[in-house]
């Protein structure tokens, strides 16, 4: 039978309309929710019982069927199935949409998946979906051709008509001109006639006048004229002159002249008339020509216009392609041009139709592949993006048209509840409002379509439906968010998943749990390390069901109901039952914030009075708890397995070492330290000083008789040896009779008392014990008792009896933990006792102000006055003055601290507290007794006005005001830092949550070099760094060459000492950075588990441990640098938390250092403006030599330039020598030497405030730092490769933590850095089927390449990518983990399109779906073993068992193999089983054609 919850992968994909309908139990057609009078769900509404199931268990809507006996009956009256009401949490409905709508995730995401698939820009796609533009969905090709021909015919006819009209007009113009010219001829002749007649009349007039005058003159001839006689105004005879023959001649002359003038005028008039006629004729002819030309132009214009119009229309027809987007105007035009040729539409329906008709994924993939191969730059980038989407659809089996919804699922009503409030009003989930909007608009649209409403109204309603569905899926993604009453934004389905309040983070990754409580904590000084005090009232509530059961079992109550009553009334028997119950249970205590795994530990509960939880003082450090009002939560692990896990793994006494650095975390502190310090102090001159005793017992007797002071130095003879150095004299004595060493030592009673409390192997410690000393005792104790060599068989059997038959290493760990816990408890009791008896307390008298202080202050004031004087005189700048003043006061503060130190009474309580490490440090004492010194202002700049007073003297108002600045900044910084550190931890956990120890050995030959030369004041010593690592190569003695240790040996304390003693200064070790495990890490690359001091176990969640170890001390790091004012030098730009974030996010650092891009020689150049440039010049010279054989002669001259492939010498028979280089040729005797210089230059401009690290002429390597600051890790990766950047990131992170005194093992940082470098970017896909630019896991990449190479194909090439932790988290293989981290909608969109499968390998994804995490005890089921590994291992085991049988009886050791049912089989059966299984596996070799599906189901038992 298949277990429904037992699956090992989960897949997400797009839902088809058929899927949505198959999930549904009915269609929701009404927007109603519940009836306001009956308060029952409306039929066919959003809460309909017929669709979603009954609201009451086993009862139908109308009440016809009630009770469980009708289970499964569907009521014939109301249609409701009689079943449990909880089906309303799982039954879905659906809405049939009247018009398809797009799913906003696939439209508005970046990049728009729908847009990429259709090759439409997101803006255009949006215009189509929201009814602003049309998209062509169909073009009828045959009709298109007909339309083209019709247009061509129409325009041909129009051209013909225009040409015909133009011809007619031309003929008309020509005729008109001929007529006009003829008329002009006639008019000209008529004018000539008129002129002739006129002149004839004038001639006649002159002749007639002349005749009359002649007659008169003839009459008067011979007489004198009595007046002037005139002819036409000209005097012929003046008055008094005689009239004679001459007078007549004169008259004739005048007549002749007159006639000549007249004739001249006649000729002129005739000529003028002719000229006028000619001009008119020419004008007419010209006008006619112009008109003809105009006509011709107009004709041409009209023809051109027609041609253009025709061309445009034909072009528009040509652009009628399916998928083209057109505006409303263009649509109308095209519809007029080519009616019936095409169909265009708007909205999601059009897009869906387009996808169904045009998208052929296989063909599209081929086209895009070809384009990627042939194109460059932006086009290639776009094609790759498109291909990624196309391939996702192809491989996943999703259909692209499913991105457009035709059916909308309605989620179960109990997931969008509606509840009645006190006042009778209802509170409802926002989803109901959003669904109502969809249903209302959908119903309205259906009605409009039925009524055949105008297109514009239907279109508007479709757009509104699209917007309603958008708001339901992801409100606010497009346009204004839909808001409900009170203007609050309605929470859509996407909002239900996103963010801290979303489904993933609020309900799946963290839940509120039952059987828990919380209370204030108080100290429990009398508890043992594995105990806590639980208030009785609280315990009774937590264990109520168990107590009730126990009461029934004991017969105190007859049934559960009575038992419950007894518990509620708190009868005396209840406490006895509670005592019994609580014996078997451990409880978990948790203090928020849970920054690391030690924030939750298991304890045995001791019932106490009162209401506060009592906590053991030594576990406070792990919880980071104090007793100033802290609260803690209690949880009860319920199941047997949970209890067992709590007991074996979480009990506080088994969590003594910090997983971050492997040192004890239960170190005594405060009072305990003070008590032990007081106890081990030596006070010369105290009562009984210098006395001698023959034994410890004798000395103790003297002390008890009050003859000795507890701190008096006394001499004692004792047997045994000293543990560590002694701070008092020691004299060795002759050995005792049994050979034990003896000595005479100076010590004190206090030290004897302390040593009496130590385990025997840890004695005798004859020195002042401070906090560090106590830490050493705990560490030594754990180390001694967990080392198998120090344990006897009896001790191991003792553990076996109580903890079962476990592995000896595990038994040693348990024994060591228990012994250390006992030791810690004894020290605790001793410390508390003597802190009390010592009576050390601080009074105001203990704080003495040193007399020197006032001199120091006066001196400093004088120096400051001198500096001010120099500044006023202009000898120094304002900045220099400030720096000098700050320096003077810092020096004065330093001197004051020294003075306070010297002035302290070493036996005074203040000094004891400080020097023992119990509380406080010299700086704080100095603020009380010396001077407070300089303060920082809110920006972090130091205020140059110091506080010269101390708290003993009291601060003035100004002092107090100045000090508030720094204090306030400190508080604000702490608050900010906490949030930042929390977020950093979250990102680290996310990036490393799937790093689990999955296999024994990945078999890699790679590793990490640890160099002793790297030891500096910040880095740990080599001895510490190599502890717990596994050797990656054999290590030999430097001088003798003998093998010290082989590969894959764990370096423990002894081996580390031996390696250093052999003179080796560097060690090649395995590291998580180089682990080749396909999933998680292997045991050997990780090495020692720091929390146990033993090799890490399979199933350990080392990724999370690493993240917690780095994140937990994050709050201790400073937030920003305190600048000492002025320009910060580049090396102090970022420190503390921001620097850690910078490192793990792989950002370009602030104050970035310049790196050398090539190997070469440095030249530092400064231009006129003072800008510095570093030039790196690299000159490589290559030479090639060509010997000249017999008969060969050069064809070039000495020192001539030659190029590659040039003939440089010829020999007999046309033989030639050709050069392989381009450069200069030198002829030297019988050979030619060609020399080529490869010259490279790089110039880098140095920022004005950067300090240059290199000298002029210095040789540098690529990737070397040229200026101060932090290197950009991306550049480092490019220039020096993966190993350099790994080393850099680990060292940089360590520098930040170590500078703050935080100790973290390198291993943890390496785990994170490995995750940052896990991806590679494909450059050339080869035959792998990957896409260029795709990010892929490096293990997956190696596997694909190996498969391809084994099949004879071309492998892919790729570049290592360095991703920041946020990006790396989002790029994880698990979509559940990525979606629950950040950018939920984007992750789910991508995953759905790709049909991603989550194999549930990490922790988060298993927590999300509610399965046990594949770590710790949850991994046994999960260990994946490849087929070949299994066969190999079985073969090896078979061989071993055979060897064992052949071996002599005394050397034979039984190593029975667990059979599948967990029992141990007898040896012979075991062999038979192995052999049979092995043969079965090997026989399957020849017949290896099982389908993949069969192979997956054929799970092998995990042997």
Curated annotation (Swiss-Prot):
Transmembrane segments: none
Organism: Chloroflexus aurantiacus (strain ATCC 29366 / DSM 635 / J-10-fl)
Gene name tied to this protein: rpoC
Reaction catalysis annotation: RNA(n) + a ribonucleoside 5'-triphosphate = RNA(n+1) + diphosphate
Assembly: The RNAP catalytic core consists of 2 alpha, 1 beta, 1 beta' and 1 omega subunit. When a sigma factor is associated with the core the holoenzyme is formed, which can initiate transcription.
Binding site for Zn(2+) 2: 1002, 1075, 1082, 1085
Annotated segments matching region Disordered: 1439-1503
Any one GO CC term of the record: DNA-directed RNA polymerase complex
Keyword annotations of the record: DNA-directed RNA polymerase, Magnesium, Metal-binding, Nucleotidyltransferase, Transcription, Transferase, Zinc
SUPFAM superfamilies xrefs: beta and beta-prime subunits of DNA dependent RNA-polymerase
Membership in a protein family: Belongs to the RNA polymerase beta' chain family.
Record's protein name: DNA-directed RNA polymerase subunit beta'
Lipoprotein found in the keyword field: no
SMART domains the record matches: RPOLA_N
Described purpose of this protein according to its UniProt entry: DNA-dependent RNA polymerase catalyzes the transcription of DNA into RNA using the four ribonucleoside triphosphates as substrates.
CDD domains tied to this protein: RNAP_beta'_C, RNAP_beta'_N
Alphabetical list of Pfam families matching this protein: RNA_pol_Rpb1_1, RNA_pol_Rpb1_2, RNA_pol_Rpb1_3, RNA_pol_Rpb1_4, RNA_pol_Rpb1_5
Binding site for Zn(2+) 1: 60, 62, 75, 78
Binding-site positions, Mg(2+): 626, 628, 630
């Amino acid at each position: 039978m298949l277990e429904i919850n037992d699956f090992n992968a989960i897949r997400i994909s797009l839902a088809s309309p058929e899927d949505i309908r198959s999930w549904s139990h009915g269609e929701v057609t009404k927007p109603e929710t519940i009836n306001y009078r009956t308060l029952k769900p409306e039929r066919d509404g959003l809460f309909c019982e017929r669709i979603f199931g009954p609201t009451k268990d086993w009862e139908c809507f109308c009440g016809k069927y009630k009770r469980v006996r009708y289970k499964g009956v569907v009521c014939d009256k109301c249609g409701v199935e009689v079943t449990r009401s909880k089906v309303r949490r799982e039954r879905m409905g659906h809405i049939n949409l009247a018009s398809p709508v797009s799913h906003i995730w696939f439209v508005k995401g970046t990049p728009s998946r729908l847009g990429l698939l259709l090759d439409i820009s997101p803006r255009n796609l949006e215009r189509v979906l929201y009814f602003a533009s049309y998209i062509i969905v169909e073009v009828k090709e045959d009709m298109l051709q007909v339309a083209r021909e019709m247009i061509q015919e129409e325009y041909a006819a129009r051209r013909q008509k225009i040409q015909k009209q133009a011809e007619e007009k031309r003929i008309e113009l020509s005729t008109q001109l001929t007529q006009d010219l003829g008329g002009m001829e006639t008019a000209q002749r008529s004018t000539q006639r008129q002129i002739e007649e006129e002149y004839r009349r004038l001639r006649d007039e002159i002749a007639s006048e002349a005749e009359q005058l002649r007659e008169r003159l003839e009459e008067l001839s011979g007489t004198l004229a009595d007046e002037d006689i005139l002819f036409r105004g000209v005097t012929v005879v003046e008055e008094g002159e005689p009239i004679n023959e001459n007078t007549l001649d004169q008259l004739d002359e005048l007549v002749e002249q007159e006639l000549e003038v007249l004739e001249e005028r006649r000729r002129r008039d005739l000529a003028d008339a002719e000229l006028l006629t000619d001009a008119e004729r020419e004008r007419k002819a010209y006008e006619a020509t112009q008109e003809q030309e105009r006509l011709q132009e107009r004709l041409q214009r009209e023809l051109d216009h027609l041609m253009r119009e025709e061309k445009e229309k034909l072009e528009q027809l040509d652009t009628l392609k399916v998928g083209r987007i057109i505006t409303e105007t263009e649509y109308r035009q095209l519809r007029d041009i080519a009616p019936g040729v095409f169909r265009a539409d708007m909205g999601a329906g059009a897009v869906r139709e387009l996808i169904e008709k045009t998208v052929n994924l296989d063909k599209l993939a081929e086209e895009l592949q070809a384009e990627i191969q042939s194109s460059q730059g932006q086009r290639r980038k776009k094609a790759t993006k498109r291909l990624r989407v196309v391939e996702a659809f192809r491989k996943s089996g999703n259909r692209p048209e499913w991105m457009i919804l035709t059916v909308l699922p309605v989620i179960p009503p109990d997931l969008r509840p509606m509840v009645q409030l006190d006042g009778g009003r209802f509170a409802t989930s926002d989803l109901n409002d959003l669904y109502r909007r969809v249903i209302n608009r959908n119903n309205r649209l259906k009605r409009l379509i039925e009524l055949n409403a105008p297109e514009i109204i239907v279109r508007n309603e479709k757009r509104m439906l699209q917007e309603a569905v958008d708001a339901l899926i992801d409100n606010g993604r497009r346009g204004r968010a839909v808001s409900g009453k009170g203007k609050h934004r309605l929470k859509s389905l996407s909002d239900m998943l996103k963010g801290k309040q979303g489904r993933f983070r609020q309900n799946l990754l963290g839940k509120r749990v039952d059987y828990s409580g919380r209370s204030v904590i108080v100290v429990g000084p009398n508890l043992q390390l594995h105990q806590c005090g639980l208030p009785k009232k609280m315990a009774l509530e937590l264990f109520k069901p168990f107590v009730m059961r126990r009461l029934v079992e004991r017969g105190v109550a007859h049934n559960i109901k009575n038992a419950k009553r007894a518990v509620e009334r708190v009868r005396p028997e209840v406490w006895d039952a509670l005592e019994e119950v609580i014996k078997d249970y451990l409880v978990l205590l948790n203090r928020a914030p849970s920054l690391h795994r030690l924030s939750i530990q298991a304890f045995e509960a001791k019932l106490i009075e009162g209401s506060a939880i009592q906590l053991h003082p030594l576990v406070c450090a792990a919880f980071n708890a104090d007793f100033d009002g802290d609260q803690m939560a209690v949880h009860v692990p319920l199941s047997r397995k949970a209890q067992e896990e709590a007991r074996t793994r979480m009990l506080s006494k088994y969590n003594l070492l910090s997983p971050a650095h492997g040192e004890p975390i239960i170190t005594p502190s405060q009072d305990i330290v003070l008590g032990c310090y007081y106890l081990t102090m030596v006070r010369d001159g105290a009562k009984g000083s210098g006395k001698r005793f023959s034994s410890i017992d004798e000395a103790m007797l003297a002390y008890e008789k009050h003859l000795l002071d507890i701190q008096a130095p006394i001499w004692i003879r004792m047997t045994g040896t000293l543990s560590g150095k002694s701070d008092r004299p020691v004299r060795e004595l002759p050995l005792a009779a049994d050979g034990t060493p003896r000595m005479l030592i100076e010590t004190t009673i206090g030290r004897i008392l302390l040593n009496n409390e130590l385990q025997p192997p840890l004695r005798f410690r004859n020195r002042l014990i401070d906090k560090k000393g106590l830490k050493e005792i705990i560490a030594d104790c754990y180390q001694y008792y967990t080392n198998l060599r120090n344990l006897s068989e009896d001790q191991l059997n003792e553990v076996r009896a109580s903890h079962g038959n476990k592995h000896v290493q595990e038994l040693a760990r348990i024994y060591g933990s228990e012994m250390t816990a006992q030791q810690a408890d004894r020290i605790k009791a001793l410390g508390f006792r003597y802190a009390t008896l010592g009576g050390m307390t601080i009074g105001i008298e203990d704080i003495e102000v040193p007399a020197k202080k006032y001199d120091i202050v006066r001196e400093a004031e004088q120096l400051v006055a001198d500096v001010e004087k120099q500044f006023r005189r202009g000898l120094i700048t304002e900045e220099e003055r400030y720096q000098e003043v700050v320096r003077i006061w810092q020096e004065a503060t330093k001197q004051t601290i020294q003075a306070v130190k010297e002035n302290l009474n070493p036996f005074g309580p203040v000094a004891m507290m400080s020097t023992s490490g119990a509380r406080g440090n010299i700086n704080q004492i100095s603020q009380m007794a010396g001077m407070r010194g300089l303060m920082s202002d809110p920006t972090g700049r130091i205020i140059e006005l110091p506080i010269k007073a101390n708290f003993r003297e009291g601060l003035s108002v100004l002092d107090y005001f100045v000090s508030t600045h720094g204090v306030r900044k400190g508080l604000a910084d702490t608050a900010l830092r906490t949030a930042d550190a929390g977020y950093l931890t979250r990102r680290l956990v996310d990036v490393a949550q799937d790093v689990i120890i999955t296999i024994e050995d990945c078999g890699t030959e790679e590793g990490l070099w640890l160099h002793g030369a790297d030891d500096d004041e910040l880095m740990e010593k080599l001895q510490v760094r190599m502890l717990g690592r596994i050797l990656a190569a054999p290590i030999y003695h430097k001088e003798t060459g003998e093998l010290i240790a082989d590969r894959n040996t764990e370096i423990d304390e002894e081996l580390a000492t031996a390696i250093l003693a052999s003179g080796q200064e560097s060690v090649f070790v395995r590291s998580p950075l180089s682990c080749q495990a396909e999933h998680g890490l292997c045991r050997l690359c990780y090495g020692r588990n720091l929390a146990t001091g033993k090799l890490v176990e399979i199933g350990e969640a080392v990724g999370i441990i690493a993240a917690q170890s780095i994140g937990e001390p994050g709050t201790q790091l400073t937030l920003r640098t305190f600048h000492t004012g002025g320009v910060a030098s580049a090396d102090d730009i970022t420190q503390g938390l921001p620097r850690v974030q910078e490192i793990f996010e792989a950002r370009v650092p602030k104050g970035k250092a310049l790196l050398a891009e090539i190997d070469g020689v440095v030249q530092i150049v400064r231009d006129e403006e003072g800008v510095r440039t570093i030039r790196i010049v690299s000159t490589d010279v290559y030479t090639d030599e060509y010997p000249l054989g017999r008969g060969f002669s050069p064809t070039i001259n000495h020192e001539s330039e030659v190029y590659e492939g040039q003939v440089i010498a010829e020999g007999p028979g046309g033989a030639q020598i050709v050069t392989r280089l381009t450069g200069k040729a030198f002829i030297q005797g019988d050979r030619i030497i060609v020399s080529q210089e490869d010259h490279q230059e790089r110039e880098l401009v140095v920022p004005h405030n950067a300090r240059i690290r290199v000298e002029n002429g210095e040789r540098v390597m690529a990737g070397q730092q040229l200026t101060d600051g932090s290197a950009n890790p991306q550049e480092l990766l490019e220039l020096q490769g993966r190993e350099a950047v790994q080393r850099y990131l680990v060292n940089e992170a360590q520098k930040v933590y170590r500078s703050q005194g935080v100790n973290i093992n390198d291993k943890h940082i390496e785990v994170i850095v490995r995750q940052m470098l896990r991806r590679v970017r494909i450059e050339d896909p080869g035959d792998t089927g990957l896409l260029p630019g795709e990010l892929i896991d490096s293990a997956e990449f190696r596997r694909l390449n190996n498969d391809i190479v084994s099949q004879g194909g071309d492998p892919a090439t790729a570049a290592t990518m360095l991703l920041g932790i946020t990006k790396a988290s989002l790029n994880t293989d698990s979509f559940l983990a990525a979606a629950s981290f950040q950018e939920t909608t984007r992750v789910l969109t991508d995953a759905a399109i790709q049909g991603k499968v989550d194999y549930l390998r990490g922790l988060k994804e298993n927590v999300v779906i509610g399965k046990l995490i594949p770590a710790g005890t949850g991994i046994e089921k999960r260990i994946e073993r490849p087929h070949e590994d299994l066969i190999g291992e079985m073969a090896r085991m078979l061989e071993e068992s055979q060897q064992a049988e052949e071996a002599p009886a005394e050397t034979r050791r039984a190593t029975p193999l667990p059979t599948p049912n967990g029992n141990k089989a007898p040896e012979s059966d075991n062999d038979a089983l192995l052999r049979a299984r092995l043969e079965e596996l090997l026989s399957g070799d020849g017949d290896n054609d099982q389908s993949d599906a069969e192979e997956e189901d054929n799970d092998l038992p995990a042997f």
